[in-house]
Amino acid sequence: MVMLKISSFLAVYALVVCQMDSFQAAPVRPGLESITDRVTLSDYEARRLLNALVKDFIQMTAEELEQASEGNSLDRPISKRCASLSTCVLGKLSQELHKLQTYPRTDVGAGTPGKKRNVLNDLDHERYANYGETLGNN
């Protein structure tokens, strides 16, 4: 992108240098006279070239502005808009917390619904399981 801008400015500069000879202006440097003698453009060609360069430059700047406006949209996550500011870090943490709260639950792990075993109750139940049988036999 930068190379296109530089090349367009160089082309405009070359156009101006070529036109300096046609307007009988003094050259910037004496060494440029031989270059301007070899390269001559008619007024029509020079205007067309200048119009094309201006249109390209306007189109490039419009595309850059469009990309910049897309880059600052609210649809992008906060983490991509800024990285190290404290408000951005807090925003990123709140996004992660929200993701964890809205994330669908799975049926594995310690806090899942279903049959829960209590080890102490199981030991007491096994200890007194035969108590009723011994009373019935006496």
Curated annotation (Swiss-Prot):
Disulfide bonds join 82-88. Keywords: Amidation, Cleavage on pair of basic residues, Disulfide bond, Hormone, Secreted, Signal. It is found in: Secreted. One of its GO terms (cellular component) is extracellular region. InterPro entries: Calcitonin, Calcitonin-like, Calcitonin/adrenomedullin, Calcitonin_CS, Calcitonin_peptide-like. It holds the Pfam family Calc_CGRP_IAPP. It comes from the Eukaryota. Residues 26-79, 118-138 form a propeptide. Residues 1-25 form the signal peptide. PROSITE patterns: CALCITONIN. The modification Proline amide is found at residue 113. Its main location: secreted. GO terms for molecular function: hormone activity. Causes a rapid but short-lived drop in the level of calcium and phosphate in blood by promoting the incorporation of those ions in the bones. Belongs to the calcitonin family. This is Calcitonin. It comes from Gallus gallus (Chicken). The gene is CALCA.
